[in-house]
């Protein structure tokens, strides 16, 4: 990074479709939440409708200064980058080829960052993944009321 983290005024967090289905998503999201809470920095989340709804529900339990935007086309990511100012930083949720949230456009991210973000702050997050049987056992469905309550309780305990 070319500038101190304390000078960042806003983080742009871009999430791929189905990011909320990754077994390590909530753990990774916790890292972003901690950045927002500890720095007081505004966070702008960009993701598809389902993923944004999951994050909005969590925000109701543990509030941070955040805005949410529906974003479905990773080919249009440059539009988000064009909104960024000098004191903004990027947090990009990524996925490996075997992960459910993987998008082919992710293969172009390193080159794009090298060409256009060389002197800007950015963070690439790869949520941890489990083998398929373990993933199925650990996966939570935010649409399931019991799972939602459990996720909310876990997040609430973490932030106490």
Model-identified regions with their sequence ranges:
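Repeated scaffold domains used in trafficking and secretory/extracellular systems
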Residues: 76-80
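Intrinsically disordered or low-complexity boundary/linker segments at protein termini
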Residues: 1-74, 85-91, 95-160
């Amino acid at each position: 990074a070319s500038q101190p983290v304390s000078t960042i005024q806003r983080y742009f967090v871009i999430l791929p479709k189905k990011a909320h289905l990754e077994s390590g998503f909530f753990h990774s999201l916790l890292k972003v939440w901690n950045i927002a809470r500890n720095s007081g920095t505004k966070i702008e989340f960009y993701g598809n409708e389902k993923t944004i709804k999951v994050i909005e529900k969590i925000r109701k339990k543990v509030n941070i200064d955040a805005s949410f935007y529906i974003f479905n086309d990773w080919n249009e990511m440059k539009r988000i980058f064009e909104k960024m100012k000098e004191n903004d930083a990027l947090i990009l949720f990524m996925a490996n080829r075997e992960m459910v949230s993987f998008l082919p456009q992710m293969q172009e991210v390193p080159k794009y960052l090298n060409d256009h973000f060389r002197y800007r702050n950015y963070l690439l997050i790869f949520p941890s993944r489990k083998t398929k049987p373990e993933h199925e056992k650990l996966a939570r469905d935010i649409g399931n009321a019991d799972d939602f309550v459990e996720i909310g309780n876990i997040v609430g305990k973490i932030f106490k």
